[in-house]
């Protein structure tokens, strides 16, 4: 196998990893940092590679929600109250991360983008998820690990996207800021933050997916603008392969997650985070 072929296979694998982990609460950035280090993926345009494969994931979620997204845009422009309120909530949730990111993201990447940080945040985040899920009592008769689609969390005050308040949306936005630290997980922070704020699990997941569109798109465009000079002709094939892999795998994951959360809690992801964090810590110690 030639070095060029091996490089493309690594790019394809990382694209799959991005698509599989972007929309579940396990931290796609953390996985890319750790796995990229494990497989020794070297690219002169590494930052651009990560940004472009994230575009693949973004396009996947936009494609899946295209009908609802068009309804939201049309309703907002024509003054439909529910859609205007939903757009307001997305903006409120988007702004904290946009402001904090614009000011501190460079420092955050310099200080926190390291496998050791990922190991710690994976474990801590896993225990926080277990704690939040424990606070969400299930209806009698639920199977172990199952969650009722609309009434499993007795503390929830928002069971649909339209019922989310401005205060709850802002709380989700503040939680999203924490996800700038690798290993925390953007989807994990926004979903768990939403549940703490009183949003029902499945609704919090859907809101997280919609919030991902402006957040990830904005971050990707900003990073691409800042790092476009790093793009080399040699890496174009790897970037294209990673983009397609991320798009296709994200298509599968988003649909699967929506089905999963209708009948299950996030405990399995919490235990996965804890186990992976311990494995990463052991690997770092053994190096």
Swiss-Prot record:
It comes from the Bacteria. GO terms for molecular function: undecaprenyl-diphosphatase activity. Keywords: Antibiotic resistance, Cell inner membrane, Cell membrane, Cell shape, Cell wall biogenesis/degradation, Hydrolase, Membrane, Peptidoglycan synthesis, Transmembrane, Transmembrane helix. GO terms for cellular component: plasma membrane. It is found in: Cell inner membrane. It catalyses: di-trans,octa-cis-undecaprenyl diphosphate + H2O = di-trans,octa-cis-undecaprenyl phosphate + phosphate + H(+). HAMAP family: Undec_diphosphatase. Bacitracin is thought to be involved in the inhibition of peptidoglycan synthesis by sequestering undecaprenyl diphosphate, thereby reducing the pool of lipid carrier available. This is Undecaprenyl-diphosphatase. It comes from Bordetella parapertussis (strain 12822 / ATCC BAA-587 / NCTC 13253). The lineage of its organism: Bacteria, Pseudomonadati, Pseudomonadota, Betaproteobacteria, Burkholderiales.
């Amino acid at each position: 196998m030639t070095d060029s072929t091996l490089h493309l296979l690594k790019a394809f694998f990382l694209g799959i990893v991005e698509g599989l982990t972007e929309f579940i609460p396990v931290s796609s950035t953390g996985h890319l940092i750790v796995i990229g280090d494990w497989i020794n993926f070297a690219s002169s345009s590494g930052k651009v590679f990560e940004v472009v494969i994230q575009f693949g994931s973004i396009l996947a979620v936009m494609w899946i929600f295209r009908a609802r997204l068009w309804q939201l845009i049309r309703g907002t422009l024509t003054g439909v109250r529910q859609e205007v309120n939903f757009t307001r909530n997305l903006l409120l949730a988007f702004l904290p991360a946009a402001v904090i990111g614009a000011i501190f993201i460079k420092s955050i990447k310099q200080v926190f983008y390291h496998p050791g940080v990922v190991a710690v945040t994976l474990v801590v985040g896993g225990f926080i998820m277990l704690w939040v899920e424990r606070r969400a009592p299930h209806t009698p008769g639920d199977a172990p690990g199952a969650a009722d689609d609309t009434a499993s969390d007795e503390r929830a005050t928002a069971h649909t996207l339209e019922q989310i308040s401005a205060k709850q949306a802002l709380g989700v936005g503040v939680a999203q800021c924490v996800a700038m630290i690798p290993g925390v997980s953007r989807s994990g922070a926004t979903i768990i933050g939403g549940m703490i704020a009183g949003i029902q699990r499945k609704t919090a997941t859907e809101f997280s997916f919609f919030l991902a569109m402006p957040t990830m798109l904005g971050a990707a465009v900003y990073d691409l603008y800042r790092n476009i000079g790093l793009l080399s002709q040699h890496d174009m094939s790897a970037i294209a392969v990673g983009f397609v892999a991320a798009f296709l795998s994200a298509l599968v994951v988003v649909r699967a997650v929506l089905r999963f959360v209708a009948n299950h809690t996030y405990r399995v992801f919490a235990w996965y985070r804890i186990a992976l964090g311990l494995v990463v810590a052991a690997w770092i110690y053994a190096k």
